[in-house]
């Protein structure tokens, strides 16, 4: 077929040669038909009537197929003679002939399945609002599946997500710069007409951005890959959950290698969850059964197992073997792990790394693979006990929780002034309103509803007073119990568990990623959708994992410094990212030049770090 393609040049003289190729293709199809018909006639009739009937039917279908090709060739000749054939129509015919040659199973004698039938196990609700139902264990290997006609390529999925990210980045830039000009105008440095013009640019720019994002969402829903995304997400999640279950339930607990993790890290609930996830990642990487020491837990003295299901069904303690501190040796039976801040040496599989064997599939499926990876450990760890599940169900019912809904988390008290700046309620609600206007870009009207969680009860009361047009779901009593003086109680624990649960089930998150509670909710959210990487707005930090290894991004567009604050970037450079200023620029350090500074966010792409981890063969 390469020869056929080469014959289609700009020269009109190539049509005669092209015609010869098409006639040869037609002769080949007739030859196949004759051979099949001859073979059919050579069979003995006795006892084979049914088989012969099927073969005759196949031959007739092939004859019809050949007749259609004959008609197309005849039409082609007529168009050639009248100089009415353009190159595009010719190439379409070439493509059809090529597909028939490369995919004989798609010929009329065997009708292929409809695209939908290939994904019978996909959930009916493809909007991503509901969690994917648990399916039966799948034996799909962790390697990259051959993506065929009904699966997207890595490049397609990567490009789609990159466009979505950069739509937001370009708006960050223009809104920030025009906002500065507007402030200058308001201060009396320009006329009122100019101020009004700038306001119109901002308003129309925001509407244009919402339209683009709405189009992107429509493209995702209609590109034909949504069923694949749900199936692939379910298959990958099932694979990881089976591996974790296998790791945590060894056949011989007494002689199994173990990793001891002590729950009582001196920090809040979200921080402690991340501590347990870090322990679990190390256990997974070293093929050690995780032993969680939780008796006397500051949030619940009875321990983890009274709130969530045990991390193991059969192996609950370290046994009588001697224990050794990290790093120990490969044959050390019981290893005690310190907190991530004091871990030395630091292994390469710490966040932000994902398993090498899963990485090709994850990069194709998800916009931020490390968040998905962390979410899988939380999915296993946070399986509720029946009493906890009943509490969550009744809590949702009592609050009147329903979709669509935006989850808003406002962190105050001990974080403000030390680890994070104070953000007004208006800042959060600006992005909430923008989300709902994006939903309404097609002219529909959507009920405005938010779930508001905070450690300051006054925040909920303030929001209800300032935004009466919103249905604001939240419990001021839970917020009061989350204050520093009362947060380490059973009541406060129930409140924070409910808050995180409802935040994670929201359609969109508005919060500060400096808060571990917000990051935990975002991580759990990834288990609710095939890809929820873009379902958030952080008012401060980008996503990070406390104690992580370097967060690098790769330069894809060169950058010449515009000011003394800018970095010089070459294509291929790695930039260690410190944060996003949400004005179109990010801050980081060029690892090639070792210089720090600002750079346009759209000129880099995420570099997904991988680490060689156990394959858990046969699981």
From Swiss-Prot:
May also use Ca(2+). The enzyme has substantial activity without divalent cations. SUPFAM superfamilies: SH3-domain (SSF50044). Its main location: Golgi. Keywords: Disulfide bond, Glycosyltransferase, Golgi apparatus, Magnesium, Manganese, Membrane, Metal-binding, SH3 domain, Signal-anchor, Transferase, Transmembrane, Transmembrane helix. InterPro entries: Fut8, Fut8_N_cat, Fut8_SH3, GT23_dom, SH3-like_dom_sf, SH3_domain. A motif (SH3-binding) lies at residues 345-351. The chain crosses the membrane at residues 18-38. One of its GO terms (molecular function) is alpha-(1->6)-fucosyltransferase activity. It is a single-pass type II membrane protein. GO terms for cellular component: Golgi cisterna membrane. Residues 255-539 form the GT23 domain. Residues 39-619 are lumenal. It holds the Pfam family FUT8_N_cat. Disulfide bonds join 253-315, 261-279, 267-271, 511-518. Its EC number is 2.4.1.68. The keyword Transcription does not apply. Belongs to the glycosyltransferase 23 family. PANTHER family: ALPHA- 1,6 -FUCOSYLTRANSFERASE (PTHR13132), ALPHA-(1,6)-FUCOSYLTRANSFERASE (PTHR13132:SF29). This is Alpha-(1,6)-fucosyltransferase. The gene is FucT6.
């Amino acid at each position: 077929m390469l020869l056929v393609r080469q014959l289609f040049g700009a020269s009109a003289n190539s049509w005669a040669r092209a015609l010869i190729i098409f006639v040869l293709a037609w002769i080949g199809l007739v030859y196949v038909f004759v051979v099949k018909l001859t073979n059919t006639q050579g069979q003995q009739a006795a006892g084979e009537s049914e088989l012969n009937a099927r073969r005759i039917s196949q031959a007739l279908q092939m004859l019809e197929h050949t007749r259609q090709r004959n008609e197309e060739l005849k039409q082609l000749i007529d168009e050639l003679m009248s100089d009415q054939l353009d190159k595009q129509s010719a190439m379409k015919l070439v493509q059809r002939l090529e597909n028939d040659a490369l995919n004989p199973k798609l010929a009329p004698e065997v009708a292929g399945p409809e695209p939908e039938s290939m994904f019978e196990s996909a959930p009916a609700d493809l909007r991503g609002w509901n969690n994917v139902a648990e399916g039966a264990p799948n034996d799909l290997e962790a390697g990259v599946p051959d993506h065929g006609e009904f699966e997207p390529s890595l490049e397609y999925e990567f490009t789609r997500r990159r466009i979505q990210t950069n739509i937001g980045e370009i708006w960050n830039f223009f809104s920030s710069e025009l906002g500065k000009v507007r402030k200058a105008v308001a201060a009396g440095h320009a006329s009122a007409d100019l101020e009004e013009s700038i306001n119109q640019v901002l308003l129309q720019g925001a509407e244009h951005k919402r339209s683009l994002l709405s189009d992107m969402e429509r493209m995702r829903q209609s590109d034909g890959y949504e069923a694949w995304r749900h199936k692939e997400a379910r298959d990958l999640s099932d694979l990881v959950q089976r591996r974790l279950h296998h790791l945590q339930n060894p056949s011989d607990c007494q002689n199994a290698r173990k990793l001891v993790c002590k729950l009582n890290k001196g920090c809040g609930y979200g921080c402690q969850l991340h501590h347990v996830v870090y322990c679990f990642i190390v256990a997974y990487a070293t093929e050690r059964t995780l032993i969680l020491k939780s008796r006397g837990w500051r949030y619940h003295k009875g321990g983890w197992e009274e709130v969530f299901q045990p991390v193991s069904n059969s192996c609950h303690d370290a046994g009588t073997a001697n224990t050794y501190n990290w790093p120990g040796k490969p044959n050390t039976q019981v290893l005690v792990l310190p907190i991530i801040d004091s871990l030395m040496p630091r292994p390469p599989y710490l966040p932000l790394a994902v398993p090498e064997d899963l990485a090709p599939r994850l990069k194709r499926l998800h916009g931020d693979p490390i968040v998905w990876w962390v979410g899988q450990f939380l999915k296993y760890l946070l399986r509720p006990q029946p009493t906890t599940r009943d509490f969550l169900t009744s809590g949702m019912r009592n609050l009147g929780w329903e979709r669509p809904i935006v989850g808003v988390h406002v962190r105050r008290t001990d974080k403000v002034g030390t680890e994070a700046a104070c953000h007004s309620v208006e800042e959060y609600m600006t992005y909430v309103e923008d989300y709902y206007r994006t939903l309404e870009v097609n002219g529909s009207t959507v009920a405005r509803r938010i779930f508001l969680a905070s450690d300051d009860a006054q925040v909920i009361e303030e929001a209800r007073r300032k935004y009466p047009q919103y249905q604001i779901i939240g419990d001021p009593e839970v917020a009061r119990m989350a204050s520093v003086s009362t947060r380490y109680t059973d009541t406060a624990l129930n409140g924070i568990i409910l808050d995180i649960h409802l935040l994670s089930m929201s359609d969109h998150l508005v919060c500060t990623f400096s808060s571990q509670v917000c990051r935990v909710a975002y991580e759990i959210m990834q288990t609710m959708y095939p890809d929820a990487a873009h379902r958030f707005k952080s008012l401060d930090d980008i996503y990070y994992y406390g104690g992580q290894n370097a967060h690098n991004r790769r330069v894809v567009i060169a950058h010449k410094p515009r000011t003394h604050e800018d970095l010089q970037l070459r294509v291929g450079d790695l930039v260690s990212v410190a944060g996003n200023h949400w004005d179109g620029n990010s801050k980081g350090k060029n690892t090639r030049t070792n210089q720090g500074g600002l750079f346009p966010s759209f000129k880099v792409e995420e570099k997904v770090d991988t680490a060689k981890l156990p394959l858990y063969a046969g699981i």
